[in-house]
């Protein structure tokens, strides 16, 4: 099977399993990246070469986080076990055990510095929604105007992680910025999607990440601060302001309460 045929079949395999749009595009994007790295038919890639890719290239050279390395590993497993129908020795390609640590959140001063450095109103609005409503980056690119409920001050999140739908809070600041962005900065094109690129195409995860890194450097923040850090700040704020774990779990779209409980250790509260 050629790599082109592999990608075509992999695409169909994911569609048959009803993967969310975010997962589908992430798997396809990183799948192409993996294929480009080896530069030969994936059927010819050895287990030792896969180990070297995961644990030397991704971990040592690129210094990716354990979560990111495991994501690549999951794609490799899907590629071989499902698409190529080829057994893979998982003991030789183990998932990295994630180190338990405290989520990084930003201080009020750091947040103020960061937002003051963002000189593009569209991206400032995007970052405010991540901070004020706790949306994942993939959920932001899928936002439609019809998802914004200004009467009940909430946002409908379609196709969240695991294809789950939910409602989350729409802050007054986010609503004001959305209205300003829509009326003054967004081009009048025929698309219900809120955020578009400069070419009037749907916004992508990659573009947002690149812009975030640019403004993070401009603000002088630690390189470990990511777009997802804004979501961590949102959850921590909820807990510090009296929200219950169940409420936070639903607003964040967590499938397991244990994910929500990790924010208790970050929040400035007495238990």
Go through each PLM region and give its residues.
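Conserved catalytic core of the tyrosine transesterase superfamily
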Residues: 1-271
């Amino acid at each position: 099977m050629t790599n082109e045929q592999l990608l075509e079949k992999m695409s169909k395999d994911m569609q048959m399993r009803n993967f969310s749009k975010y997962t589908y595009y992430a798997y396809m994007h990183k799948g192409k990246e993996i294929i480009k790295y080896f530069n030969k038919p994936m059927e010819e890639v050895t287990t030792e070469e896969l180990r070297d890719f995961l644990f030397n290239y991704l971990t040592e050279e690129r210094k990716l986080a354990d979560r990111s390395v495991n994501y690549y590993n999951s794609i490799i497993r899907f590629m071989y076990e499902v698409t190529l129908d080829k057994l893979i020795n998982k003991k030789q390609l183990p998932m990295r055990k994630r180190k338990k640590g405290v989520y990084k959140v930003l201080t009020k001063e750091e947040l103020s510095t960061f937002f003051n450095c963002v000189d593009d109103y569209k991206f400032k609005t995007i970052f405010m929604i991540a901070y004020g409503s706790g949306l994942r980056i993939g959920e932001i690119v899928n936002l439609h105007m019809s998802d914004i409920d200004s009467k009940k001050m909430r946002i409908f999140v379609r196709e969240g992680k695991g294809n789950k739908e939910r409602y989350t809070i729409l802050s007054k600041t986010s609503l004001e910025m959305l209205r300003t962005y829509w009326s003054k900065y967004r081009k009048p094109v025929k698309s219900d999607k809120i955020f578009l690129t400069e070419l009037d195409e749907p916004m992508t995860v990659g573009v947002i990440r690149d812009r975030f890194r640019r403004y993070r450097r401009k603000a002088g923040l630690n390189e470990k601060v990511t777009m997802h850090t804004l979501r961590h700040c949102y959850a921590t704020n909820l807990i510090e302001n009296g929200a219950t774990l169940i409420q936070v779990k639903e607003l964040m779209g967590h499938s397991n309460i244990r994910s929500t409980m990790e924010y208790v250790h970050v929040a400035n509260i007495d238990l």
